[in-house]
Amino acid sequence: MNEVATQGLVAVAGATGRVGSVIVEGLSDAGAAVRSLSRTPSDPDTAGARSTSRHIDYADAGSIASAVDGASVLVISLGSSDDQARQEIALIDAAVHAGVEHVVKVSSWAWPSRMHPIDWHLQIEDHLSKVDIGYSLLRPMTFSAVIGAQANLIKNDLWGGAAGTLPANLIDVRDVADVATRLILSGAASGPVRRPYHLTGPGGLSMDAIAEHLSLAIGRTVKYTHRTPDEQRALLLSLGLPDMIVGLLLGIDVEAFASGASTETTSTVEAVLGRPPRSIPDWITESAGLFR
């Protein structure tokens, strides 16, 4: 990032997560004042004179209020869980009460759905729209890292699902984080402005095409086995995955991939960053070690 940070304190909720950790790193490297918020208790000292960390207890209203107090911008990037909507709404309400000027919410490529976590994100977005605070909504396509979550299945020749044959335009989590960081450092994510940003990769690939790229990257044949939703559910449950995770994975397959909802391409990442987003083959090449 080339900007020199001039805004006030940025509080980052979900600071140890896949997106949040990269945001914290980017802001800290640019000299921004950052407060990293995490459920994991930690010392108040972190690397960087303008960066601190703080434990946040989402069951304690006082802890939430203290976490956002004094911040100009609040980044919300929590992981998917049954408590996600409650926790993020509590953060938003605390931010409004504390006088935080702007929320950067890492959401999802959303459409009306009962599928988790899309319905949770929509609930949070609806609440955010009704309170008096500026916001930047980052709505990314499914992350490329969803392939990495299948690493054990790929290693054991069990990879497959109900994703169908349409291309999925997955996005690298680093691009999502880089967009958030650039918006904050440039001042675009500040004050009362309210704007969504729809984020995708540079172009989609089908699961069969992704399998071909995996094969080239690791030097052995990888196949994607097409299954019905019921067959995929039975397999995942037999492997001991929790019901919620099984539901998330099946929902992505059926509602995001097979439906064609993940085929779109936007120019938003390049417009914000001045460079194209990382491609799925790029991610596979960098992450090949996960699948060997």
Describe each PLM feature range.
Residues 3, 16, 36, 192, ...:
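A hydrophobic C-terminal alpha-helical subdomain
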Residues 2-49, 56-65, 69-71, 80-89, ...:
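Oxidoreductase cofactor-interface core, primarily capturing Rossmann-like NAD(P)-dependent enzymes
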